[in-house]
Amino acid sequence: MFSGTQFPIGRLLILGAAFTITTACAPADTEPRDVTGVSSATDLTPSAARLGPEVSKGLASLRNATARFHNVDAAIAAGYADPSGLPCVSSPLGTMGVHVVNRSLMDQAVTPDQPELLLYLPKANGGFKLVAVEYLVPVLVQNNATGNVDAWTAPGLWGDGYTRITQPPSVFGETFVGPMPGHDPGMPWHYEKHVWVWDTNPNGMFSQWNPSISCPS
C-alpha cells in the first residue's frame, strides 16, 4: 500500500505496488468479441457509429501490440503484474475486471501501444480473459512556496498553495477521466482512460464500466 501525502517524481515507477500480488498464473481465452462497431464513450448504440480512419488505425496498432497479452505469462514477462489473487472490480454500473499494472510504464507520457494497465476478466475455469486496457497518468502538482513538484497522494484536493502541473491527457481523441483521487491509500490523484479493445462495451469503447460482463460469483 502507498503512504504519505506527497509522492516524489522519482518514485512514480513503484505505483504498481497496490495492484501487485505474485502467485501462479493460468491460461487466458484468446478469442475476443467483435468491437468493430464501437466508437466512443458517448455511443449508447455502438453499431450505429463507426470510428474515424486515424482512430481505427491507432486501435488496430493497439490490438497488435497487446494481442500477445491474451497469454497471461506473456503479460507477466513484459512487466505486468500477475492477475492471480487480485480483486475483480465491479459496481452497479458494470464491471472493470482485474487491473494489472506495468510499473515501468507509469509516468507522464501517454504511449498508445504501451498501456499502463491491462484489464482481465476471471473465467470460471480459473483462467483470465483480456478485455481492455487502461491508460493512467499521475497528477503532478507544484508547491508554490518551495517549487517542488510531486504526485499528489492526499485524500483531498490540493489547495491554493499548489499549482496543478499535469493537464488532462487524451488518447485516440478521447480525454481522460479525472483528475480523481487514488483508489488505494497513498495512490496519487490521476487521470485514466479505459479502452475496450478486446471486448464489446454497449456503453462505448472508451467508457469506464462495461455492463455486458460480470465478475464470477
Task: Show the residue positions of the predicted features.
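N-terminal secretory signal peptides that target proteins for export/translocation
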Residues: M1-I9
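Sec-dependent signal peptide recognition
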Residues: G10-L15
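Residue-level signal for mature regions of secreted extracellular proteins and peptides
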Residues: A18-F19, A81
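C-terminal motif of bacterial Sec signal peptides marking the signal peptidase cleavage site
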Residues: I21-A24
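Bacterial signal peptide processing site
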Residues: A26-D29
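Primary mode marks residue(s) on the alpha4-beta5-alpha5 output face of response regulator receiver
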Residues: R33-S217
